[in-house]
Structure formats: structure tokens, C-alpha cells
Amino acid sequence: MVLVRVLANLLMLQLSYAQKSSELIIGGDECNINEHRFLVALYTFRSRRFHCSGTLINEEWVLSAARCDRKNIRIQLGMHSTNVINEDVQTRVPKEKFSCLSSKTYTKWNKDIMLIRLKKPVNNSTHIAPVSLPSNPPTLGSVCRVMGWGTISATKETHPDVPLCANINILDYSVCRAAYARLPATSRTLCAGILEGGIDTCKGDPGGPLICNGQFQGIVSWGSDPCAKPHEPGSYTKVFDHLNWIQSIIAGNTTATCPP
């Protein structure tokens, strides 16, 4: 009888903890430590605080958002918990940075992309490995995975110790146009989210990856303010539409131009 009571009390504590944990996040959960080997954190030397994410696409190149550009950027790879550091964490600085437009003049609606060449290549390890560029664009309705260390509250800037992951859907571009009146008629972006709200990327997540069916399809760009509002999905730079530019830069053609 005593054992039954003890087990019942433990179950109640577990349920209570689970409920409180779910109330602390914008629709996400802690990522599995093995599912984000390509996810990198961007921070500045002075702040030491993650302001953006990025995606490792080979041992020497990281793809992020133009809005994430800063002076004295540091790139941390192999991170999971900010409290318990993985043994294979590596830190790099940029050798070169390329954007379609200057980070000061890019439009909020388009061309939010930055390619970073690392000063020193990284070594693949238990928690570090690149992700492949997409072979095809994502299909409408695809279930995609977003991840990052962005704020876990829509009203107060509170960052988690570990990256959070959540599933969202690729939506028709017209859904984003209906939500944001200033969007152009066409754009090289993806509209993605949950129409009911409650699940969204937020401050600190820009530059991170949108993974659809195992392929790197989007770069977190911007969304509603406050985050996770119903019928106001997020905007993601469409990686597939920028493949030629990305591959040309990596191949050494540093004067390559982005798609119009």
C-alpha cells in the first residue's frame, strides 16, 4: 500500500513538471541531441549571447540570414545545452561573408540570406555534421522542422538552455500575403507555420534552418509580433531558389549575383 502511494505521488510530480514545462515554450520541445548536428549558434565577442542561428552546409560554409550580420561574429558548432557543454564543441570566426544585399539594405520581405565562409574548416564529430542543400523545392502542406535557441515566450525575452524543435507546415504564399499587407505579389520566400497559432519561431531564431522531409529548405527570417499569433505564419528564405548563387560563391565566383 505504501509503495502504491509512493508511485502515485511520483506520477503526480511527473505530470505537474510536464505541465509546467509545456507552459514555458512557444509550441516546441527540447530537440533530440542527435537531430541538429548542422545547427550552429551565432553570437558576438562582446555579448557572448546567441542572437541568431545558422546551418552548416559543408566543413567550411555556414548559411544564415542577412539580418544576423554583426561585427565580431563568433560561430559555435556542436552546441546543445548551454550549461553542459559537449566535448566536441568548436568555435569559428568568419573569413568572408556574402549577402545578396547589404544587411543594412536588404528588404524585410526578400533576400534575407547570408553565406559565411569559416576561417578554419570544422571537423565532423558526434555533434557536428553538415546538412545537404535541397534537390527539390518543398511541396505545399509538407511538415517541416524548425529549431533554435530563440526566446520561449511571446511577451518576455526568455531564452532556453537547449535548442527547441517544433513541427510546422508549408502554407500557400497567399496565406502570408493575407496576414501581411505589405508583402509583394511574388517572393523567393516560403510561408510556413500553424494557422491556429501557438507554434512559431521567435526572437533569436532567425538564420536557423527549416528542415522538410530531411532537406534544408528554408532560413528563418521573420514573423508576427508577438510571435505565434493565429493566422500570422512566418516567412523563410527559400534555399532552393538561391542554390545557383550559393554554389557559385562556394566554387569561387564571389561576384555571383542573387536571383532577381
Swiss-Prot record:
GO terms for cellular component: extracellular region; secretory granule. Glycans are attached at N123, N124, N253. It is found in: Secreted. GO terms for molecular function: serine-type endopeptidase activity; toxin activity. Keywords: Disulfide bond, Glycoprotein, Hemostasis impairing toxin, Secreted, Serine protease homolog, Signal, Toxin, Zymogen. Belongs to the peptidase S1 family. Snake venom subfamily. Snake venom serine protease homolog that may act in the hemostasis system of the prey. This is Snake venom serine protease homolog. The lineage of its organism: Eukaryota, Metazoa, Chordata, Craniata, Vertebrata.
